[in-house]
Amino acid sequence: IIDGAMFGYGTPIGTHFAPHNPDYVDLTGNSNYDPELSKKLLAEAGLSEGFKTTLKLPPPSYARRGGEIIASQLRAVGIETEISNLEWAQWLEQVFRGKDYGLTIVSHTEPMDIGIYARPDYYFQYDNPEFQSLMTELNGTTDPSKRSSMLKKAQRMISNDYVNGYLFELAYTTVANAKVRGLWKNAPTQATDLTGVS
């Protein structure tokens, strides 16, 4: 998917955290591409003939190109997808607010927002009381090593529960004049801080 949708620019992930996060746990093995295992799991679920679903995609190229690749991979194991290319307003209304979708692709780029998984009303509707308790405990914990352990446990929970198919961290490619100084090498937020730029 990274090669086909992003021309090789991207880093595989297996959970909601990016690899540069100090508490990142490499769980990429949980979501390896394995068509034979997929067919076996479908058969165990009583869906050996496959099924049909929707794939609603927002405008960015990672979603549109990634969606075509994923639809092809799903088709190979018997899952037919109806792709709908949506504008952002449609995606927000149908998927994010309306929760009316089978599958979607979207980049979660907000830093440290793993707590969204403790909200059953969030668009992917994960409702795990154990995870919710863990997030409540995390929010009341200040000890860095305890927080780190909790964040690692949280990543394992959502990855093992397959809340989402974690694909890759988007590359943040930019071009800047060589004379410009002070730009961040890696962006910790979605904003570009120009206060130290000269």
Residue ranges and their predicted role:
Residues 1-25, 62-71, 89-198:
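Detector for C-terminal structural segments
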Residues 22, 33-34:
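Positively charged, proline/Ser/Thr-rich regional signature most characteristic
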Residues 27-33:
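DNA breakage-rejoining catalytic core of tyrosine-based enzymes
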Residues 33, 58, 64-65, 86:
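Residue-level recognition of alpha-helix initiation/capping sites
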Residues 35-54:
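Immediate post-signal peptide segment of exported/extracytoplasmic ligand-binding proteins
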Residues 50-59, 82-84:
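Short, well-ordered beta-strand elements
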Residues 79:
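Short phosphate-binding/catalytic loops that engage adenosine nucleotides
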